[in-house]
Amino acid sequence: GDVYKRQVWFDSGSTFQHVLRGSHKDAYDRAPFHDAGPEADLYLEGHDQHRGWFHSSLLLGCALYDRAPYKGLLTHGFATDGQGRKMSKSLGNVVAPQEITDKMGAEIVRLWVASTDYSGDLNIDDKILARVVDAYRRIRNTLRFLLANVSDFDPAQDAVSDADLLEIDRFALSRAAQMHADILAHFKVYEFHPVVSKLQIYCSEDLGAFYLDVLKDRLYTNAPKSLARRSAQTVLYRITHAMLRLMAPFLSFTAEEAWQAFGSSESIFMETYSDLGTPNEALLAKWTRIREIRDQVNKDIETLRADGKVGASLQASVNLQVGPEDHALLASLGNDLKFVFITSHIILEAGSEILAKVSVSQDTKCERCWHYAPDVGVVPATLALGVLAHRNLGKHFG
């Protein structure tokens, strides 16, 4: 009799017919597009499937329904060693996912995948994994700081309205909203490695190297229920909410672990993304410039530190000359300028360009607040006195 031949990819190419009209039939029947034929949201496989599963699915979909059986198609490369070579036992360069999981945990495997550009091959070796571990620790340590500093914060009773937030806190919220919008835009088009990169930079530079560093005085030395401290906690609480939701797709265990200590619902995976509002562009521009000037001053302070003349920036005294526009910008901070620059003394002067003269403070260090001041030893230093009396300390960002 006649011999019929069937292309070997026919079975897999018809999976949309079996899945969307079989095991997932109830969901398919409720979908508004079901009359036009089954259609998956996404087909995901390696780039070798352009001639295999993707191709046979497209042929069958067009033959049966005059269209592709998927809305989107995502292809990825293959895992190679650190030098981009194909893994083989003869080369001794095989990296087994289970071994990484046993040694470092599943989070590291997930983070490696998410942080790698999957449009090409995905390189992996011990050095690459060490960098992934370092990135994970940076994100986790940031979370630990955030959780610790909102542990006594009840949003129902303690939250400060947006209008009453201190300016630097409003800036931090705008920067978080900007980061949040950028990351969601990447998620929508399945770009995961920029998500990890931007979240890591946000944790290390925006939070660790600036905002959280500046906040420590306010969080640790202001009265517990003061406006200044509650303003900071309000923003930290909202940042934590947003970060956990953004992390959950690729740092699932970590996000869930933190959520169990922080969240109000059963699981982070029952939550939707946060709404941080629209970034304030004027505020972002102002504080971006302040941070640029601060970075330049910090370089001069680091020179003193490298020479062993100061141990911390609070031991430095700064005379700062800046141009007219920058002078107006920094002068608007008043006495808070020294807290932004994390120095015990800073004198602002008009000039034509940025010029910082950094010297060692001749005052005495307060053992409670660590600031250097002339009144240490006479009475408790001003900052420490505010703590002992459980009072607000004047302006200090509020």
Task: Describe the residue ranges of each PLM region.
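Structured secondary-structure scaffolds
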Residues: 1-152, 172-215, 234-248, 365-368
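Short beta-turn/strand-loop junction motif enriched in small, turn-promoting residues
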Residues: 59-64, 306-307, 374
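Cys/His-rich finger/ribbon microdomains and the adjacent scaffold used
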Residues: 1-41, 45, 162-179, 311, ...
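Active-site catalytic microenvironments for nucleophilic, acid-base chemistry
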Residues: 60-64, 261, 392
